[in-house]
Amino acid sequence: MRSMKPPGFSSDLMDEHSVDLLNGSILAAENPSKREVAQDVPGFERKPTKVRKPRVKWTEKETNDLLRGCQIHGVGNWKKILLDERFHFTNRSPNDLKDRFRTILPEDYKKFYPNAKTHMGRPQKIPHTVGLSKSTRKERKQFTPEEDERLLEGFFLHGPCWTRISKDANLGLQNRRSTDLRDRFRNAFPERYAAAGFKLKNNPGNRSKYYQNNMVNDATTPNDSSTTEAAAAAVAAVAAVAASNPNASPQQTTEQPASDELLDWPHHNLPSQFFTSQRNPNYSTDSFLLGQSLSDPFNHTLQSFHPYESLFSAGQPPSLPISPSTSQNSVQPFPFSIQQPPLHLEPPLSSNTLNSSTLPQPNSTDFNTFPPLPSTPRISSEDIPWDNRG
């Protein structure tokens, strides 16, 4: 680039450095910067630069108020300390309170904020203060067995509606939140929680307990197929013994437990018609089924029927005719008699002849009214042509 010499100046009076400076100013005048060009554009508004607020030194009263606020509200609740009307801070922000606490108590700040990577200042000389504590949170209170029972009772009453359970005054769980009740029910009763349709979390303790209970229940509960097979085998064995001894009669036990004793029901207050004593069963030959014991009211009803023989005047019922083809040995008498209910029959007539006086007599004049029958012509044998054929 060829150096430009301004007019009116000789090269003898200026050195090379002065010439270079003069050339730079001329180039800057010919090529203005972008900012200067943008300022000439209409509608351009330059953003105002951020003005930093002046640093105000902390007074002793402000420092004491900060420490008292940390004792009352806990370290970390800077906004609560700032909004507390008992303390006065001059144009301070929550970050200013945190920075001031880090400056005056770096060791305590490191204790409450172990992951802080900010600059730790040197401790300053401050008056003696009482021990500080971090902001208090809700303490975790373990569930008692009584609360678990009431929680389970509330689940039976309201179902998985944890808000209703917490608001139920009869259960006394108002100090527990709905989420606390849900989490406790999931941890204390995982099988009922899963049966209600909820999914268990990936907690190995709950899952192992739940599956262990299910495996124990499956082991103690007999299998349906094995029980059915055992019952079928028992029935087959009893049938085989009965087939081998067809003439053997079952032995009657002298004493059998009553059904009310098995169920542990007292029957001394019940009337006798509501149950049948089974200690000394009375077998009746007049029952419809052989070997069946009937209750007292049913026997009394059967005995109230009239005998079958008393329905006839002769005293003996008419015997049915026996066909010659039927042998005498083929008819087997019944080993028991059946009492039939009374039949309302009318007595038979004294004679088998009909009484003519009871029948209506026909009128002879009625037969004369019929017209006479037409007479048919008779043909002699001589007039028949086919008789003379030979």
Swiss-Prot record:
Give UniProt keywords alphabetically.
Nucleus, Repeat, Transcription, Transcription regulation
| Chain spans, region Disordered | 30-57, 115-143, 244-278, 316-390
The record places the DNA-binding region at 78-105, 162-189
* Keyword Nucleus listed: yes
Q: Where in the cell is it found?
A: Nucleus
The cellular component terms of Gene Ontology attached to this UniProt record, alphabetical and capped at eight, are: chromatin; nucleus
Offer one example of a GO biological process linked to this entry: regulation of transcription by RNA polymerase II
**Which cysteine pairs are joined by S-S bonds?**
none
Q: Does the keyword Lipoprotein apply?
A: no
Q: If researchers knock out this gene, what phenotype do they report?
A: Leads to lethality.
Q: For bias kind Low complexity, which ranges apply?
A: 347-360
HTH myb-type domain boundaries: 50-109, 135-193
The coiled-coil segments of this chain are: none
PROSITE patterns membership: HTH_MYB
Give start-end positions of Basic and acidic residues composition bias.
Answer: 32-48
Q: Where is the composition biased (Polar residues)?
A: 244-257, 322-340
Which molecular-function annotation in GO is an example for this chain?
A: sequence-specific DNA binding
Q: Any idea what job this protein has?
A: General transcription factor with prominent roles in controlling histone levels and stability. Binds and regulates the activities of many promoters, including those controlling the expression of all four types of canonical histones. Is also involved in the centromeric loading of cnp1 and maintenance of centromere identity. Moreover, regulates the expression of cdc2, a protease capable of histone clipping.
Put simply, this protein is called Telobox protein 1
